Amino acid sequence: MTSFFSDYQPQKTVQPTCYEEVQETIKKANRDRTPLVPVSSGTNLQDTHLPSVKDAIAVDLSRMNKITYLDARNRDAVIEPGVTFAQLEAPCKAEGLRTLTAIEVPKEASVLGTYLEMMPLYGWPKYHPWEMLTMKGVRADGEVFATGQMAMSQDRPDKYSWGVSLAQVARLYCQAQGTLGIITNAAVTLKTIAPENQVFFFSCNNISRATKVLKAFIATEEPHEIFAVNKTYCSELLGQGDTKNLPPWTVVIVTRGFEKAEIAYKKKDLTALAKQLKGELATRLGSVKNAGAKILSEISNPTGFSLHSEDGSGWAPVVTIATDSQIQKAAGLFPKDSGSLIMPLQAGGCFYYQPDLRYSLGEEKKVRKTYLTICEKLLKAGVTFPRPSALNAKQVVAHNPSYFKLLRSIKKGVDPNNIMNPKKLGL
């Protein structure tokens, strides 16, 4: 279980099958002062399922894999942490629904784990990060808790469809399954499958142009998915062997609808905007065959780590949130062969920015130093690390001491013995 981001392995693994067993595991860990690291699946971007300390016990939640409720009318489902995207997809598809998939996270990943870890979802620009409604689980001190409607006694079966207005406290439990407790059930949102889908491409000659174009298109509120990729990332996304015929940057726009006329109307609107931007909205990308179909396939069924790496090579993403000016300054810090993805958040006020480092296996020690050097420069430039990795956690704390002092005071109140995800920063 070691990786680029962690040198630690758990001393053993336990596999609870219900919340009572989770509760007993947590109570025992408190008595023994043993650190716990919950694992819903080992498929997230920076290996945050791995321990950050020695002698931790991995709590493997994969056997808690029940879909306890599916509400097709209100488009939500109540699931346990072991439910994977592949498992949830089948009953959803039968009802004309789909899950909100995450960048780089394959179908064998845990839905709940992915959402709790705040993996970047392709649907964020359209739907924003409200993929979970309510949740329940076991706190770090061994007490059972619930948020929103799950904390209430309700007779109506669709009680999880009311939205998030009563579940704001649930946001504290995002970004790390297990830091404040282990979530054993959660209501997640689903979306309707649209029969008509169209992918458009807008070529850009540099990163500054790409962020400007992203801002313009996201302001129309028409794209269901929108992101920009440099030619390295784009070639891998499309299964191309080289980058010669690809532009330096490509903005990818996906529109969805229920009638061809609806898509045609959106195309006219987006085409007019493309002309204002002195560019072209294309349905093809150079000589690449079926580029649009490949994009739709990746969004519905993300490839994961293997998209960027082959035998003998490694891939280390740098997960950040940054403004357009910060992104322009940061781009020069990465080697020319680095891949990079940018997705607009908050109507383009900031962006999910994921550049990466490529390396040959055996070079991890050297590349880790490069990673830390780049992270330090990004922090000095004001770039945010929403989910710090085990490698750069100390750096992030050093640049935000008062913020993490507050977060640790919250954690101490719920986890006085500091047994849950010790040394991890996500809350």
PLM segments and residue spans:
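A conserved active-site cap/scaffold subdomain adjacent to cofactor or substrate pockets
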Residues: N197, S203-R209, T243-L281
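Short amphipathic alpha-helix segments
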Residues: R209-L238, D324-K336, V367-C375
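Short, conserved charged micro-motifs
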Residues: E21-E24, Q87, I207-V213, E259-K268, ...
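Conserved glycine-rich FAD pyrophosphate-binding loop
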Residues: Y8, D47-A56, D60-S62, L273-L427
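Glycine-/small-residue-rich beta-strand-loop submotif within the FAD-binding core of flavoenzymes
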Residues: F5-S6, H49-A86, G123-W124, L190
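FAD-binding subdomain of flavoenzyme oxidoreductases
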Residues: I67-L70, P81, F85-K212
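General beta-strand structural signal in soluble alpha/beta enzymes
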Residues: Q15-P16, L36-S40, D47, V59-L61, ...
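Glycine-rich N-terminal segment of FAD-binding domains in flavoprotein oxidoreductases
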Residues: T2-M64
